[in-house]
Amino acid sequence: MKFLDEAKVYIRSGDGGNGCVAFRREKFIEFGGPNGGNGGRGGDVVVEAADGLNTLIDYRYQQHFKAQKGVNGMGSDRHGANGKDIVLKVPVGTQIIDEDKETLLHDFTKVGERFVLAEGGNGGFGNAHFKSSTNRAPRHANPGLPGEERWIWLRLKLIADAGLVGLPNAGKSTFLSKVSAAKPKIADYPFTTLHPQLGVVNSDGREFVLADIPGLIEGAHEGAGLGDRFLGHVERCRVLLHLIDATCEHAGKAYKTVRGELEAYADTLTDKIEIVALNKIDAVEPDELKKQKDRLKRAAKKTPLLISGVTGAGVPEALRALAAVIGEAPVSDKAIGTAQNAADAKPWAPQDV
């Protein structure tokens, strides 16, 4: 299945049905009273977080979604039926953002969570509603109210416990394939990984989800390479595993490059707990490995782990370190900065005349 983490869609809730002007017509009853029914309410546009989805690819092929219109009222006091809601299914971790790409409307963090994005218009009153002691035969009715329409952005931020970051060719995909059943593409050239990959890791009986993010290069926050568009997927991670290639020219500079891009994207990423590991230790001589380790230690101000995704050396220790942090980190069930649900607001209703 193709991966798509951003989509722009048009949504419109259903219009309300019109009220009806009608009068009772029966034999021997010359002046039957009003009996026009009310119009039905238009359908809502609802977004629901569904299990089993991990991409927004469906919204590449369909961008317009309209809920059903309410049925018009009819004579004999027959009220119109309400229009059917339309439900958009999205993966857990999806954010709804306004057309300006800045205003966050809702953030889905749990399976089954629902959000009313646009309410259907209320149905109009039929003339029977306006009957009174002073107006026995009202000859007017309300039209139904129009539904709401807007363009919105759907943005997916995968929910993973831990995230893999590093320069291209740091060995992130090899590491993920070693510790999980994920099968990312692995090759000896930069940007082999074009989309985030997820894998379920088991460490001493404890399971967690690990995300492999496409490699970063200097200037990624300005669009260089694949840019920083995929960094949003590690915003929800509780810990980052920063892999540095031991065969690179200078491990310390490589570390600072990635840290600089993380900081340029969002300060919250640099505040996350980070485990630093020097990867591909099987591909360098002992003397060179010691130099790279010392360089990385000075840059990161912590002692790095020494691992090899190919031979598996040091990998169990890295997984235990991740699992220990994940086990201690609190999990928040609250959505992040969500706007008030439209359903909380009192809907407009036609006024009595």
UniProtKB/Swiss-Prot annotation:
UniProt GO cellular component terms: cytoplasm
Which class of enzymes does this protein belong to? hydrolase
Identify the SUPFAM superfamilies for this entry.
Obg GTP-binding protein N-terminal domain, P-loop containing nucleoside triphosphate hydrolases
Cofactor(s) this protein requires: Mg(2+)
Q: Which residues form the Obg domain?
A: 1-159
The EC number(s) this enzyme carries = 3.6.5.-
Q: Name one GO biological process term.
A: ribosome biogenesis
Keywords tagged on the record = Cytoplasm, GTP-binding, Hydrolase, Magnesium, Metal-binding, Nucleotide-binding
Residues annotated as binding Mg(2+) are S173, T193
What region holds the OBG-type G domain? 160-327
Q: Which residues bind GTP?
A: 166-173, 191-195, 212-215, 279-282, 308-310
Superkingdom of origin organism? Bacteria
The record's Pfam families line, in alphabetical order, gives:
GTP1_OBG, MMR_HSR1
Where is this chain's protein located in or outside the cell? Cytoplasm
The answer to whether UniProt assigns keyword Ion transport to this entry is no
Role summary: An essential GTPase which binds GTP, GDP and possibly (p)ppGpp with moderate affinity, with high nucleotide exchange rates and a fairly low GTP hydrolysis rate. Plays a role in control of the cell cycle, stress response, ribosome biogenesis and in those bacteria that undergo differentiation, in morphogenesis control.
Protein name, per record: GTPase Obg
Source organism of this protein record: Rhodopseudomonas palustris (strain BisB5)
